[in-house]
Amino acid sequence: MNSSHVLPNFSSDYQEGAHARVLDALVATNMEQSSGYGTDEHCERARDLIRQACQAPDADVYFLVGGTQTNATVIDAILLPWQGVIAPNTGHINMHEAGIVERGGHKILDTPAVEGKINAADVERICSAWEGDGARDHMIAPALVYISQPTEYGTLYSLEELEELSAVCRERDLKLFVDGARLAYALASPANDVTLADLARLTDVFYIGGTKCGSLFGEAVVIPERGSIRQFVTQMKQHGALLAKGRLLGVQFEALFEDGLYLTIGEPAVKATARIREALKRAGYVVTMDSPTNLTFVALDQAGHERLSDKVRYSIWETLPDGRYLARIGTSWATPEEDVVAFERALVR
């Protein structure tokens, strides 16, 4: 790789700091004296703004410090010791969270995903298998379904798919949890037909990602039915997810939800990724799936990897069975136009 200059970096979507409006809000409130642990007026106003955006006036809203803590806290708060969580085998909790769910004493009931997604039939199959097993008293019972929007591959659940998952969860008395670490990029995609209000209507809990979507750090957990998860703040504390200076989270989400910034902040990334994806196809590269958000996955042989990595940076997601690399190319709300142009030029041989 060429090290003589800084290469355009598409390795991930959380390399930059925060949106200017978020930073301005933090600076403007820096010397305020506020109560701690999310009880301040900024957190309360941010909660109200989120409730309005989700059309969920009675929702509980909590601010946590990061995605792993959020997933661990929510899953542990919902599940009893003999219960497990159904998840895609490619899901974040199953692949890249260092066994935090298992460390909390809960089994992940993973099932093969297609382009990062599972469906209602998968959930029904797992529930039916457990229910029909004569040894089920010796087995973990499915009680929660975990998905993400977008998925780890940048693909999207359609409204119809989410409605079907929600229906089977209600029929089977399961909870439905949507990881929204990159939710801003889903909301900004022209291919998306799932709104915040839909998430509030169809899920038992979801979270609105900040760390990857314009804040310095932080995620906002939305529980549409008030009081349905008891002692959640206590459980946040137990998982190291409760910030003493909680107003730092409230101020950031206040800025993100004023004037609908969160709903549009992902648009530049989605447009940039669409350009990169089309440029890759024109250059003859194999784009493995048409993910309509801010992530692109492309299969590279050794020569292609060496040629491209000399001009731009990206991450290697995995090695494919045929020996090629699956590269992940990510954009963010802050990706410079000149970096996108540089990527397009890097593909011209």
Model-based region annotation:
Residues 77-95, 124:
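Conserved PLP-anchoring active-site segment centered on the Schiff-base-forming lysine
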Residues 105-143, 147-152, 157-164:
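PLP-dependent aminotransferase-class I/II
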Residues 80-82, 274-348:
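Conserved C-terminal alpha-helix-loop-beta "cap" of PLP-dependent enzymes
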Residues 19-67, 89-90, 94, 100:
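Conserved N-terminal alpha-helix of the aminotransferase class I/II PLP-enzyme fold
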Residues 9-12, 61-65, 87-88, 147, ...:
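General beta-strand structural signal in soluble alpha/beta enzymes
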Residues 157-189:
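Catalytic PLP-binding core of fold-type I/II PLP enzymes
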Residues 115, 141-142, 146-148, 156, ...:
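Active-site C-terminal subdomain of aminotransferase-like
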